[in-house]
């Protein structure tokens, strides 16, 4: 398994796109153990990678909240998906693994959990030719595929403090048991907790001063 212990947060109350990104960054700043966070979105949203050009997505502001991620990758529609983040502090042995190893390990865990739930999927053997800036239009190696369609993708960022992996599973209605099986495939020791007020307070600052600002949204 990837970890010995794993903290799991189930965010029951959907929040804004900016706050979702801010919570992930705050967890990366302060986590002392690996954390798996599942969360939802207050409104239909679109997140796009750090280097994405806002002008390409500006028209979506009429119907969706837009947010620039701290991680890379393409654009992702949110609302009916299951969104998650994995935070690995630099102090954890798993942080020594490269990004492709972690990517494959997480998507392998998703594949195995889905199979137990009755949905057979495969990991993509190779990257497909890029056809757009939409994440789910462009399978890369080890993405989760179902009936020829990419259903799980992710983006990553590494800092001195650790590793952030933000993922989306585009299968509406995934059960609570799927989340439990996904987490159990990553570590033998699972601890389910709520996010601390310290993290939420820090996230509120990051949302107000970074992710919710026009400067950040229009960065490129």
Regions flagged by a language model, labelled:
Residues 43, 61, 77-81, 139, ...:
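Short connector loops at helix/strand junctions that flank enzyme active sites
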Residues 1-61, 68-69, 75, 188-220:
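Active-site loop/lid in soluble adenylation, ligation, and acyl-transfer enzymes
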Residues 106-134, 157-220:
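Long, positively charged amphipathic alpha-helical accessory segments at protein N-termini or as interdomain linkers
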Residues 13, 133-166:
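Short terminal or interdomain "cap/linker" segment that borders an active site or interface and mediates
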Residues 85-103, 167-173:
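Short histidine-centered catalytic/ligand-binding loop motif
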Residues 9, 28, 37-39, 47-49, ...:
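Residues in well-ordered beta-strands of folded domains
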Residues 45-46, 55-56, 91-93, 159-160:
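Short, acidic Gly/Pro/Ser/Thr-rich loop/turn segments
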Residues 70-93, 165:
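Residues forming anionic-ligand binding surfaces in small-molecule and nucleic-acid pockets
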């Amino acid at each position: 398994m990837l970890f010995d212990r794993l903290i799991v947060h189930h965010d029951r109350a959907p929040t804004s796109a900016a706050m979702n990104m801010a919570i992930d960054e705050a967890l990366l700043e302060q986590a002392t153990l690996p954390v798996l966070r599942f969360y939802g979105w207050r409104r239909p949203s679109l997140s796009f990678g750090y280097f994405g050009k806002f002008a390409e997505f500006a028209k979506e502001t009429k119907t969706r909240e837009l947010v620039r991620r701290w991680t890379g990758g393409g654009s992702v529609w949110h609302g009916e998906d299951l969104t998650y983040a994995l935070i690995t502090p630099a102090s954890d042995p798993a942080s020594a693994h490269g990004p492709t190893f972690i990517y494959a390990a997480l998507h392998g865990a998703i594949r195995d959990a889905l199979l137990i739930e009755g949905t057979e999927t495969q990991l993509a053997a190779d990257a497909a030719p890029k056809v757009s800036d939409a994440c789910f239009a462009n399978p890369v190696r080890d993405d989760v595929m179902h009936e020829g369609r990419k259903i799980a993708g992710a983006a990553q960022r590494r800092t001195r403090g650790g590793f952030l992996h933000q993922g989306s599973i585009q299968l509406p209605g995934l059960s609570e048991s799927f989340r439990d099986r996904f987490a159990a495939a990553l570590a033998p020791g699972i601890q389910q907790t709520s996010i601390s007020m310290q993290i939420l307070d820090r996230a509120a600052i990051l949302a107000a001063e970074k992710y919710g600002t026009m400067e950040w949204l229009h960065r490129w």
